[in-house]
Amino acid sequence: MPTLVAEKKRIQDLLGMDLGDRRFEKILFDFGLELDDVVEEEGKTMYRIEIPANRYDLLCAEGLCYALRAFLSMETYEDIDVEEGEVVVYKTGGEERPCIACAVIKGVDLLSEGAYKSFIDYQDKLHLTIGRNRALVSMGTHDLDKIKGPVFYKSETPERIGFKPLNAEREVNGKELGSRFPPGSKIGRYMRLIEKNEKYPLFEDSMGTIMSLPPIINSDATKISPGTKNVFVEMTGTDFHRVNTALKLLLGCFRGRKIESVEIRNGNERTRTPVMHNRSYVMGLGEINRSLGLDLSLSAAKSYMERMMHSVDTIDESTLRVRVHDIRSDVLHKCDLIEDIAIAHGFNNFRRELPSFFTAGSEIPLNKFSDKLRTELSIMGFDEALTLTLLSREENVIDGDQAVVLMNPKSASYEVCRTSLIPGLMKTVASNLHMKIPFRLFEVSDVVLLDKENECGASNSRRLAAMYCGHTPCLEEVQGSLSLLLKKCGVRHSYSTHNDSARYLKNQSALVIVEDAAIGSIGVCNPEICKTFRVPYAASFFEIDVEKLLSIYMART
């Protein structure tokens, strides 16, 4: 889950309460959050608070305290009031990131202790979460008083872009950005989002001053400071719902004196952002009480809803109309509102009772069968390895063309899902070269393969792999173990000639046939695989499909 790090004094100032750590922890717990830690940083007491992944509005101290003040009945939460503003943005390009939403915050207070840092940190949190590391949403905030309207959102070739990046010492052009921000830097990791495009999207004002180059960096010319009073906010991305939601989240947490909409002109099309949805749900008191097992009155249900930041009107003596404020983007269904009522009621206030039904669980046959295979291989003298499902492209040396590739890997070590268990066993050997040889290792686990017939485009497959690694490959070691294993399964098996140069030495491998069906292969490991993992020994291994073996086993029994 995301973590909010907020200064204790900032929290107390926003709540208007002098809370001790224990009292604050209890309030958070009742609200459904957890105070992870209290630490001292540079002489300041900081709270580390775990935030649910879908509550983007709680990722800054301001948003959290808006929610807590409503929860503690200190005030009724008010939705953002957006007035029609005068700023116009002409969209004449930017097809690389086609979705755009803008707004103006006037009279914002960034001078209060911790406010400016919180404003910047919240943008980073939104980039990381709802923006998926800026791939879906990126944002820029600018000092409105430094901008000469109207604003233009357009595209230019890199060589025609010249501007001074935020806090940079000199001006650069688009082609220099790659060297100015190398891939390992904080900003450089976002260059991959646009570097393949012929043109880069940018914002500029009527004087030709470049304001930002989304999703990379803002310009130094329009940067904000703690003294900034009026802020122009621009959001771009590939999903308008996320772009519009991120804008409303930022506006909801940092409201200033007034919020103004911005007119977006795209040819003959004119729209104003942010787009407010003002969703509402009609809920019956009986529905609420049946779901929660309570006997709430209408006034109690209404009060609970208001404590969770919703506006509520009474339709009749048993029905409520609940208006969900746009900042509560996590509410998707009536069940979310019922959950909010449960939180406000207090989970510790529910009566505990045993369920009126009883069910007996049972182990999934595939898992039960896998455990039996583990037991047998352990008896044969093999040690079990438990390796990671993710690995690098370079390490995924077997069936790499069938690999599921991660879009935004955190590390080069976790780029794809494994298509074989062998790389994991090889990495285990490579990490234990100081141990006595030979190595006898096995693993029973899932691989992930592309699958067009599956709705998510991929599927898991349970595999069993065993490896012998030493001065000589000793193919007879793994072949004998596999034959004994299949004999104990009570299935008829044989081997047929098979050449797979990616896995095995030429003429040193075979298909494993069980009841006339191929379930895997066995052979002497290709030395190139050993070299890839820097293993200075020879090896032999087998890898079989456990699901196929189980289906044959169950058909016989």
From Swiss-Prot:
Keyword ATP-binding listed: yes
Enzyme class: ligase
UniProt-listed Pfam families: B3_4, B5, PhetRS_B1, tRNA_synthFbeta
Annotated GO CC locations: phenylalanine-tRNA ligase complex
Compartments where located: Cytoplasm
Catalytic activities: tRNA(Phe) + L-phenylalanine + ATP = L-phenylalanyl-tRNA(Phe) + AMP + diphosphate + H(+)
InterPro entries cross-referenced by the UniProt entry: aa-tRNA-synth_II/BPL/LPL (IPR045864), B3/B4_tRNA-bd (IPR005146), DNA-bd_dom_put_sf (IPR009061), Phe-tRNA-ligase_IIc_bsu (IPR045060), Phe-tRNA-synth_IIc_bsu_arc_euk (IPR004531), Phe-tRNA_synthase-like_B3/B4 (IPR020825), PheRS_beta_core (IPR041616), PhetRS_B1 (IPR040659)
Molecular-function annotations in GO: ATP binding; magnesium ion binding; phenylalanine-tRNA ligase activity; RNA binding
PROSITE patterns tied to this protein: B5
Cofactor requirement: Mg(2+)
Binding site for Mg(2+): D330, D336, E339, D340
Any one biological process term the GO annotation gives: phenylalanyl-tRNA aminoacylation
Primary localisation category: cytoplasm
Keywords attached to this entry: Aminoacyl-tRNA synthetase, ATP-binding, Cytoplasm, Ligase, Magnesium, Metal-binding, Nucleotide-binding, Protein biosynthesis
Enzyme Commission number: 6.1.1.20
Sequence similarity: Belongs to the phenylalanyl-tRNA synthetase beta subunit family. Type 2 subfamily.
NCBIfam families in the cross-refs: pheT_arch
Assembly mode: Tetramer of two alpha and two beta subunits.
Protein name: Probable phenylalanine--tRNA ligase beta subunit
Organism: Encephalitozoon cuniculi (strain GB-M1)
Lineage: Eukaryota, Fungi, Fungi incertae sedis, Microsporidia, Unikaryonidae
